[in-house]
Amino acid sequence: MENEGVAKVERYRSGGTISGVVGMAAVVLLLGWGLVSNNDGMAPWAFPALVLGGVLVWAILLRPSIALHRDELELRNVLHTRFVPFARITAFRIDQMTVVEVDGKRYVGSGFGRSRLTINRDAKVGPDAPSDRHSVGWLVEEKVRRRMRPHDAVAEPGQVRREWAWAEIGALAVLALATLVTLLVA
């Protein structure tokens, strides 16, 4: 899909979005209540602990996803992201989690999956049924399988890369330490 000359990235995630938004809203409300209440407010250690909880909600419920780029699959997990070129993928499936195999190695994406019930429904419908009868997971599987075929037999596909989520890792470390220090000092 092209949009004004730029390839559109298709991003998919499982059902943690609503829980994540509710969790983040709860963190913001509790922080606001703690800031506006005078003497009966929260303990000093509760502030960094709440922000730590917010970062955990973000990292566990909102960050994980999979994305289909033009030439590669992005598996975004809690603390790292893998970029897998479509031409290198030897096997791909979406069960409870997304599983990608490349040269005998398995890479798992926790951001998108299907329930057993959905997997069984997709199997009963069959591959020749109209696309509106299948789940989103089945449709994503088919999109990836179509892209797995090498586009250019001459060009060497890129390597599988991992990028750490340094912002989340740093925030978790600093906030855990701040919570511990304020708990011990206060």
Task: Write out the residue ranges for each language-model feature.
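A membrane-cytosol interface segment of integral membrane proteins
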Residues: 106-158
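N-terminal membrane-targeting/pre-transmembrane regions
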Residues: 1-39, 142-186
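Short, compositionally biased leader-like segments
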Residues: 36, 40-41, 67-69
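Short, basic, glycine/proline-bearing loop/turn elements
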Residues: 40-42, 47, 72
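Short leucine-rich amphipathic alpha-helices used at interfaces
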Residues: 43-45, 60, 66, 110
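Single-pass alpha-helical transmembrane signal-anchor segments
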Residues: 28-29, 46-61, 175-177
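Acidic, Ser/Thr-rich low-complexity segments on the non-lumenal side of membrane proteins
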Residues: 84-115
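Conserved beta-hairpin
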Residues: 53-94
